[in-house]
Every structure is written in structure tokens, then in C-alpha cells.
Design a protein with these regions (language model features):
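Positively charged, low-complexity intrinsically disordered leader regions
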Residues: 1-30
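Short beta-strand segments enriched in small/hydrophobic residues
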Residues: 33-42
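Short beta-strand elements in bilobed, periplasmic/extracellular small-molecule ligand-binding domains
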Residues: 36, 58-72, 186-192
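Glycine-rich phosphate/diphosphate-binding loop of Rossmann-like nucleotide-binding domains
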Residues: 41-55, 137-230, 234, 244-260
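Short, well-structured alpha-helical segments in soluble
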Residues: 78-90
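Anion-binding alpha/beta catalytic cores of soluble intermediary-metabolism enzymes, centered on
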Residues: 96-162, 203
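Short glycine-rich, flexible loops that bind phosphorylated cofactors or substrates
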Residues: 103-104, 218-220, 239-240
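Rossmann-fold NAD(P)-binding glycine/threonine-rich loop
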Residues: 107-124, 128, 235-294
Length: 295
């Protein structure tokens, strides 16, 4: 058996096309241009790359975007003041503070300061709570992207046993809450395994769908999978490889070479879930601009 490759770029492009259509309609019918504000603190190279990628996506969608670049010495109060300004700016419909933040700034305080109606990352406690109880909200981008990958690739999770490996607030927990909802594209039986789970393989071998988000390179191997399962690899890890051009390469949380021989379908890294995260950010932003989520 050799798994079908689930191409995240193809599915992300489908979603972006839909967002462009929504954006054109908003501009034409209501005179609204979706606006997204990025706040970047410090000089972390990875964060700078992420913000540039997101800004480029905004341009492709026809959004208005602004980037506030702050030094790593910025105080928490100064950052809160900037967030408050964007909260009241009618031209800004989404606010994204790029994480991680410097140690002297409390991430939870910053996240909670964002108007939940502009929280396009889906991290605000109000949005987390609404997600848990099944109310409409702006959902975290990566978990929402995982659901879209499953549904649009013909691997609807309804009635399936899904094992999520990882319990982070950003990925693991929200994926669980999304896939167990009583709604189309969900209705799954969800098990979470994590670093405290004694025998992860005993759970993953039972799964129809395995979602790996544990943050450990190639931790899920082919012998840990049930033949014919679907594997979604959320991990992004850089490992040393002397044969690679730059001495390193990017891998996921799944050992692709062994898993591809067992699974029915699998996402690659790169080229899988990562493409979906930005697409779902664009979708959240246009939904926030439409103003229908919290009516």
C-alpha cells in the first residue's frame, strides 16, 4: 500500500479563491475592505517570515493590512496601548499578535486584550469557550484547517475514531473540540494522547484518523498506525541532515517514509497543514469583516 498524498496547497488555494469572492462581494455590495493588523515584537527570524507570508496573502486576497513592528524592549503597557488602538479602528477587522513574545510580556494578558470579535487567531477565552459549547466563533486557524483538509480530501471524520497526539491550546485541544461537534464535517469519536500517555502506539493503532501535533520530529512511525488510516501531520521540525543543501531539513511529527506505506492518505511536510493555516486566517478575517459571526 502507498498512501494518497493530501496536497495542502491545492485545498488552501480553493479556500483562498472562496475568500477572494467573498472579499469582492463585500467591496461591491457594502463598500467594506477586510483589514488585518499584524503586531510583530522583536527580531525573531521565523516570526518575520511568518508575518511577511501573511501580509503577502492579504495582498493576494485584496485585503488592507498594516504591520506594527516593535523592538523586543517594548513594554507590556505599550503593546496593550497599540492593541487598544486597533480594537477601535473601524478599518481593522482582525488583529494578530505574532507569538512567541519576549519573556517580560504575558501572552495571556495580550491575547485577552484583543477584541474577541477581531481575534482572527481564535485564541481569546471567549472564542475558546464558544468553540467548546458549539457556538459560532472565530476558530483557531490550524485546527480549522485540519478539518477542512479532511473534509475536502474526501476523508470526512464523521463517525470515525480520531486520535490526536498532542494537547496544546493552539492545536491539540481545539482540534478535539472542533471534530467532536454535532455538525457536518465533525461528529467524530476523539481520543487525545500526549506526553503523559504511557503507550501512545496502543491508541494510534486503533485510529481511523491520526492527527500528529506533538512537536517531536518523526515521533509517529508506520508501525504505530492501523493499515488504511488517514494521517494528518501538523508538526514542523528542523533536523540536522549533512546530505541536505543547508545541513538540515524540515520534517513533521510523523516518519513519512514508513507511514506512507501503511496509511490510506497522508499530508506531507512541508506542503500539507502549513498551507492551510494562512488560508484559514484569511477566511477568519473576511468573516470578521462581514460581521455575522457574533450577531
Amino acid at each position: 500500500m502507498s498512501a494518497t498524498i493530501i496536497d495542502g496547497k491545492v485545498i488552501a488555494d480553493q479556500i483562498k479563491d472562496e475568500v477572494r469572492q467573498q472579499t469582492d462581494r463585500l467591496k461591491r455590495e457594502r463598500g467594506i475592505t477586510p483589514g488585518l493588523a499584524f503586531i510583530l515584537v522583536g527580531e525573531d527570524p521565523a516570526s518575520q517570515v511568518y508575518v511577511r507570508s501573511k501580509g503577502k496573502a492579504c495582498d493576494e486576497m485584496g485585503f488592507h493590512s498594516v504591520t506594527e513592528r516593535l523592538g523586543s524592549s517594548v513594554t507590556q503597557e505599550e503593546l496593550l496601548h497599540i492593541i487598544a488602538r486597533f480594537n477601535t479602528d473601524a478599518a481593522i477587522h482582525g488583529i494578530l499578535v505574532q507569538l512567541p513574545l519576549p519573556p517580560h510580556i504575558k501572552e495571556n494578558t495580550i491575547i485577552e486584550a484583543i477584541d474577541y470579535r477581531k481575534d482572527v487567531d481564535g485564541f481569546h477565552p471567549i472564542n475558546v469557550g464558544k468553540l467548546v459549547i458549539g457556538q459560532d466563533c472565530l476558530r483557531p486557524c490550524t485546527p480549522a484547517g485540519v478539518q477542512e483538509l479532511l473534509v475536502r480530501s474526501g476523508n470526512d471524520p464523521s463517525g470515525k475514531h480520531v486520535v490526536v497526539v498532542g494537547r496544546s491550546n493552539i492545536v491539540g485541544k481545539p482540534i478535539m473540540n472542533i471534530l467532536m461537534q454535532k455538525q457536518k464535517g465533525a461528529n467524530a469519536v476523539v481520543t487525545i494522547a500526549h506526553t503523559g500517555t504511557r503507550d501512545i502506539a496502543s491508541f494510534t493503532r486503533q485510529a481511523d484518523i491520526v492527527i500528529a501535533a506533538i512537536g517531536k520530529p518523526e515521533a509517529i512511525t508506520g508501525d504505530m498506525l492501523k493499515p488504511g488510516c488517514v494521517v494528518i501531520d501538523v508538526g514542523i521540525n528542523r533536523i540536522q541532515d549533512p546530505t541536505a543543501k543547508n545541513g538540515s531539513r524540515i520534517v513533521g511529527d510523523v516518519h513519512f517514509a514508513s507511514a506512507v506505506k501503511v496509511a490510506k492518505a497522508i499530508t506531507p511536510v512541508p506542503g500539507g497543514v502549513g498551507k492551510m493555516t494562512i488560508a484559514m486566517l484569511m477566511k477568519n478575517t473576511v468573516r470578521a469583516a462581514e460581521g455575522n459571526v457574533y450577531r
